């Protein structure tokens, strides 16, 4: 894999997304999210079946539970998006052929000094 700006950016997005997922989203919010979803679904089914009052009450309580879980859901979605786009950046960044990797380049003639040659000659004279 070639290391360039895209792969580094992708890696940082993945690391940040995983930290948001595990740091910001605890798994304790999954239970109210599931219960709220089931209650909202049951309320809609009751409302459609003609039981208007119980459908509104059950659906309303479920919606309130879902709204309270909304920051958790948004955080998880944001973390998943960061991991996905980070991975995509890393994969696309490593496919670039125009970017050189971190292979050492040979020194050009302008930067080569003849100090070693002169030092060897100096030592031979002594």
From Swiss-Prot:
Keywords: Cell membrane, Membrane, Transmembrane, Transmembrane helix. It is found in: Cell membrane. One of its GO terms (cellular component) is plasma membrane. The chain crosses the membrane at residues 11-31, 56-76. It is a multi-pass membrane protein. The keyword Transmembrane applies. Induction: Induced, via the two-component regulatory system LiaS/LiaR, by antibiotics (vancomycin, bacitracin, nisin and ramoplanin), cationic antimicrobial peptides (human LL-37 and porcine PG-1), Triton X-100 and severe secretion stress. Its main location: membrane. This is Protein LiaI. The gene is liaI.
């Amino acid at each position: 894999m070639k290391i360039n700006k895209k792969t580094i950016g992708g890696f940082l997005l993945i690391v940040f997304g995983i930290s948001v997922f595990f740091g910001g989203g605890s798994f304790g919010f999954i239970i109210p999210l599931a219960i709220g979803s089931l209650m909202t679904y049951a309320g809609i089914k009751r409302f459609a079946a003609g039981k208007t009052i119980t459908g509104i009450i059950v659906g309303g309580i479920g919606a309130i539970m879902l709204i309270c879980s909304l920051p958790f859901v948004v955080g998880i979605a944001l973390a998943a998006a960061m991991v996905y786009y980070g991975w995509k950046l890393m994969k696309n960044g490593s496919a670039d052929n125009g970017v050189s990797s971190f292979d050492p380049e040979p020194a050009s003639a302008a930067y080569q000094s003849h100090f070693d040659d002169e030092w060897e000659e100096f030592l031979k004279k002594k």
